[in-house]
């Protein structure tokens, strides 16, 4: 996908990886970048607008844990304004295994619900034009950080959901791929809680190993967007972009 002149919705586009990715997207010259985030950050929005004045950057407050009907109402406002949307990026995520229900609600259910809502506008069975979804998952969806099993499981669920979306593309007209960052230097990983305090130093221990910057991750994210490969499972780790081959151990045969 050539980003230039496209209309993009970015859920959580002001977060750690999200904001640097928003910067890289704006540099590539989309027509519209619509950022949906829980907390408004006027300074960040102003920075994005200044980075490329030709790009229309707009912000709407959005909590991914709201019901599908609420998300659909918000998306209708956006679609009525833009007429078409080319790409949805689902990027909301939290890392805190003390908050079990919220971790699942944000990292998994929120991705499912936002995707379900946009299908009302994109699904070709309803006369829609189709579209592209990029879901930010995690390398923990491949192999868990076992000290944060709730977070890891939520990301594995989001990855599985994305893989299914890709296979449904011939039916819906909506393609999908996953973005799976490795350990990236964000506020998310500086301090977080392990499940039942099984490892109080989990954040410190993780950061003792090689990491990547948010800029490195963002630059590779944009490369994945440009590749636009339905069903791709992208690993963004240590400053590199790599397509992962999923190992099949079972098949439903349907």
UniProtKB/Swiss-Prot annotation:
SUPFAM superfamilies: NAD(P)-binding Rossmann-fold domains (SSF51735). GO terms for molecular function: alcohol dehydrogenase (NAD+) activity. InterPro entries: ADH_Drosophila-type, NAD(P)-bd_dom_sf, Sc_DH/Rdtase_CS, SDR_fam. One of its GO terms (cellular component) is cytoplasm. The keyword Oxidoreductase applies. Keywords: NAD, Oxidoreductase. It catalyses: a primary alcohol + NAD(+) = an aldehyde + NADH + H(+); a secondary alcohol + NAD(+) = a ketone + NADH + H(+). NAD(+) binds at residues 10-33. GO terms for biological process: alcohol metabolic process. Pfam families: adh_short. Substrate binds at residue 138. The active site is at 151 (proton acceptor). Its EC number is 1.1.1.1. The keyword Cell cycle does not apply. Belongs to the short-chain dehydrogenases/reductases (SDR) family. Homodimer. This is Alcohol dehydrogenase.
